[in-house]
Amino acid sequence: MKLYFKYLFVGLFSLSFYAVNAQNVVGYCGTQSSPISDAQLDANLAYLAIHKDELKVRDVRYVPVRFIIVQTSAGKGGINVKNAFRMLCKLNDEYANQNIQFYMKDDFKYLNNDLVNTDPQSQGAGNIMKNVKDKNALNFFFTAEIKSDNPGSILGFYSPEHDIMVIKNVEATYESQTAPHELGHFFSLRHTFYGWECQPWNVGDHGKVVTFTVAPCYGAQVELVNGSNCTTAADKVCDTPPDYNFGFGWPSDCRDYNVEVYDKNNELVRPSQNNYMSYFFGCSGYHFTQGQKDVIWADLNSAKRNYLKSTYTPPATTVSNDIEYQLPTDGQEVLKTAPILLQWAPVPNATFYIVEYSRKKGFDSNVTVTEVVKTNQYTIPASYFPSGLATGYWRVTAMNEYAICNVQTNPPMSFNLVNVVSNKVLTEVKSWQINPNVVASGHLYQLNIDMNKKSDMELNIINSAGLVSHHQKLNFTNGKHSVEIKSAKLVPGTYLVVLKNDSGMESRKLIIQ
């Protein structure tokens, strides 16, 4: 049983419409008409009629977003977290000209439930999501499917009753228009063709000249080209031209809509194909009109959206995507049967990192693990890589709650998987030692080294848990050198000082008291 009357596409179209257009039906919006959304739109329009001037000055509003990844009841599947970030990046780009920006509030939530994962519009699934959602954020649920009894595929929907967004996993991308469209519904916008959802225009049923005044659905008025009824018809926004759902079934390359359709005044109807609230696919320059933007801003500032008010400001609007990888170095040998420590230098203004490790250089999704971590280290579990594999790959992307648009374009790091790590000496080094090798915490100690050849080297101090406590890059010329190191960050314990370069690696013991 559905929560409200749903846009029904079965049996309401003429056979001629399906014969011509069925091959072009790739997906549609599942947002349902409801008294709740109707009342909210009317309240927003009433507010604008009186207070529109108050909304002219619009400082940037940061809106908290919570992501809920839905998996099977067995905990399988679920969207890749990178796709959620790409979708959020898209929303920020598309809503930037409205001074509305979204940021990730708290960590990802996970919900293991088959019903929600396949039929999120069912009453049972709706009640589950209502109980799971974050009451102080705009909630996005990502599901594998959105069950429909009608032709085509539901791509996403906003539930006014539960105040949640649901996006089909495959639609969580930067390229898809689904999330900006459904977010328009969240902010009380209707389709530009409101009233034609259940029966898009076709010449057999409606004629070349549409003479009737009431649209097929919801008792909505048929909007006229001259704008005389724009405040009461269709989407009730006057700077969006009439649209009788011409986009449903239209080829998804957004070719010009060249079908001649006239309203009752014999005026040619020309829809806005690249409006976010239309049904035309594959267009460029999707946009909201100023009238739609006003409704969105009024909705965001309404009492109903008080739960979205936040004092958050981003630590930085951008985060560098240059990662200084530390361990393992590119091509380093690691034991495939032991945990593999990954470490990189902290990135300024980053509050978390996406870590990916893979069995293939191309990071194919079926052989790649993606994790979100808040530190600059991650340990791959022992024996993750199969025994016959020779090379593993990894990469890191830095982000913060708002700066989520980074895409990793640098070549990945690799490590060689071995059963026994070879003990290669440093051929450029005559001798080296740590002096003293027993030192009180906070005191200085030295690396004394005698080189027989210049070399770039790395020094790592590793604690008893196998984590890197200190990392330093060094450059030596031929001869003797001393490098002072302070132990202020080292707690008492036993450490391994590892010196390495491309030719080999050697270690010495260090004790902090």
Indicate where each model-derived feature is located.
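C-terminal outer-membrane/trafficking sorting elements
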Residues: 425-435, 439-513
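Beta-strand-rich modules
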Residues: 384-403
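C-terminal tail/sorting-segment detector
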Residues: 22, 39-40, 404-420, 492-513
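Active-site-proximal segment of zinc-dependent metalloprotease catalytic domains
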Residues: 126-201, 210
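The catalytic-center signature of Zn2+-dependent metalloproteases
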Residues: 172-286
